Amino acid sequence: MHRRWLSGLRFEQAVQHVVLEDLIAAVEAATERRDRLTRQIEAVLPEWSLASVAQALQALRGVALVNAVTLVAELGDITRFASPRQLMAYLGLVPSEQSSGQSRRQGGITKAGNGAARRMLIEAAWSYRFPARVSRDLLLRQEGLPQPVRATAWKAQLRLCRRYRRLAHAGKPATVVTTAIARELAGFVWAIAHQRARHAA
């Protein structure tokens, strides 16, 4: 649909049309590469020892195949974190702190730890700006998953959508809101990974 609309654009100078066509070709090449890599991930996923965790994480809104696989590949065995707070700290999603004597000041997030996994959570967090609902794609991703995992994912969606609206309504910048949502989302990732570990045992 977008391609058709772009093809219909007319420019005063021919060089502008050449540049547009070049940009369209670059987007199409990137899309084909993404699709090819996604198919390869789908093909090897069943053989992976952490596949069940990656599949379970897809129950969360904003966490599709590539996002889930990246999170699990970057974090490894998520059950090694004793608490959600440890995972949040590892991801650099906790506030920095400067303390001196009796004064204590918190700043922005530390950005310590795994940047790739943190980016995946922040990307996923943007989807919580919309009202809570189970889309057709999300329903397909949740098919066959245990009820406790689906219940946790729905609880996450209700809480995070509400929190996103509340923070945005309070006038917080979008990046601050999204980072706060990503931090809480990490807690739900931790919970689902632990549910899968108990289910597998």
PLM regions: where:
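A detector of single, family-specific signature residues
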Residues: 1-201
